[in-house]
Amino acid sequence: IVIDYLQLIAGSGRGGENRQQEVSAISRSLKALARELEVPVIALSQLSRSVAQRQDKRPMMSDIRESGSIEQDADIVAFLYREDYYDREGENDGTIEIIIAKQRNGPVGDVKLAFVKEYNKFVNLEVRYDDAMA
């Protein structure tokens, strides 16, 4: 199940809940749904605007919009980062970073891939023998 984008899901409408509480309840419900149906649920979320104010634009867990419970409930949190999105004047090297910020059952880290913008396609970077030996 893919949810594009989590913050568009309407809350329960119960009085007294703010949007952060609603998003937390939605996040918990999706986690319960995944367990009940024994299927993965991929929920896309928007980042807060604070990313644009920082020098280093790479997204962090605290940038997830409207709820800390999203990062708590998730088994995996991954971000996409393209330097050329923020530095349009710079040289586009055609790469994208997948930042694995949280993985409940494994390691975290970054993976750099080639990004073919015309096709919205990710491909493995070619590793030359010279680069691999350095």
List PLM regions with ranges.
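Helical hairpin unit composed of two closely spaced alpha helices linked by a short loop
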Residues: 1-44
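C-terminal regions of RecA-like/P-loop NTPase motor modules
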Residues: 15, 28-38, 49-134
